[in-house]
């Protein structure tokens, strides 16, 4: 299936009034995770634009350290995903504690970059946009269009770059399983 770039959402939808933001329920991790995944899929192009702007500014100020940081993060992420698909312990950790998995990737990247220097470039250039994405995705309430777009992604009617990344992190498998179970129950 072809990979489609999600459309750029209107900025007044991306940053609406405060009535469309709410603190997540920290006691219900699965609901919070669902909100984050849904918003990451729906606003992925907006997140990419914001991250590209921030990374460009930091990269302009310190290009070598920014490139080094990007290479290290990509290599560490790829290594952890490969290891998680080949080792049961990492696979379980990635599935049960996705936030911890991402934090381990970030900490490992931080450690490797600190060996080469340029730690602050890494923190502000790469990690800060990721942190902003996570905060926005956690706080932004979903709307009906968001839910519809996510269902299309979940059942495989469309593929997006963020969907591929979330699949690598095994964040969409559970939803697809739940959806197929729901359909089979409806048939009975």
Curated annotation (Swiss-Prot):
Keywords: Acetylation, Cell membrane, Cytoplasm, Cytoskeleton, Endoplasmic reticulum, Membrane, Transmembrane, Transmembrane helix
Highest rank taxon of the organism: Eukaryota
Record flagged with keyword Methyltransferase: no
Cytoplasmic side: 1-35, 78-93, 136-188
Region (Required for homodimer formation and heterodimer formation with ARL6IP1): 103-117
Locations listed in the record: Endoplasmic reticulum membrane; Cell membrane; Cytoplasm; Cytoplasm, Cytoskeleton
Modified positions (N-acetylmethionine) in chain numbering: 1
Classification via Pfam families: PRA1
Gene Ontology CC terms: cytoskeleton; endoplasmic reticulum membrane; membrane; plasma membrane; presynaptic cytosol
Subunit structure of this chain's protein: Homodimer. Heterodimer with ARL6IP1. Forms multimers. Interacts with ARL6. Interacts with prenylated RAB1A and RAB3A. Interacts with SLC1A1/EAAC1. Interacts with RTN2 (via first transmembrane domain). Does not interact with VAMP1, VAMP2 or VAMP3.
Reported function: Regulates intracellular concentrations of taurine and glutamate. Negatively modulates SLC1A1/EAAC1 glutamate transport activity by decreasing its affinity for glutamate in a PKC activity-dependent manner. Plays a role in the retention of SLC1A1/EAAC1 in the endoplasmic reticulum.
PANTHER family, A to Z: PRA1 FAMILY PROTEIN 3 (PTHR12859:SF2), PRA1 PROTEIN (PTHR12859)
Family: Belongs to the PRA1 family.
Name of protein: PRA1 family protein 3
Organism expressing this protein natively: Bos taurus
Record lineage: Eukaryota, Metazoa, Chordata, Craniata, Vertebrata
């Amino acid at each position: 299936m072809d990979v489609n770039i999600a459309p750029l959402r209107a900025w007044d939808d991306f940053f609406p009034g405060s009535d469309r933001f709410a603190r997540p329920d920290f006691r219900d991790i699965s609901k919070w995770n669902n909100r984050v995944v849904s918003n990451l899929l729906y606003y992925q192009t907006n997140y990419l634009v914001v991250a590209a702007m921030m990374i460009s500014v930091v990269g302009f100020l310190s290009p070598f350290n920014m490139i080094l940081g990007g290479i290290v993060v990509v290599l560490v992420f790829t290594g952890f995903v490969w290891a998680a698909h080949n080792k049961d312990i990492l696979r379980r950790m990635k599935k049960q504690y996705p936030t911890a998995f991402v934090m381990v990737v970030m900490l490992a990247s931080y450690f490797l970059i600190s060996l080469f220097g340029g730690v602050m470039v890494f923190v502000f250039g790469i990690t800060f946009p990721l942190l902003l994405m996570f905060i926005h995705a956690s706080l932004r309430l979903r709307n009906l269009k968001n839910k519809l777009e996510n269902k299309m992604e979940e059942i495989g009617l469309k593929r997006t770059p963020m969907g591929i990344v979330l699949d690598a992190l095994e964040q969409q498998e559970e939803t697809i399983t739940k959806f197929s179970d729901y359909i089979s129950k409806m048939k009975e």
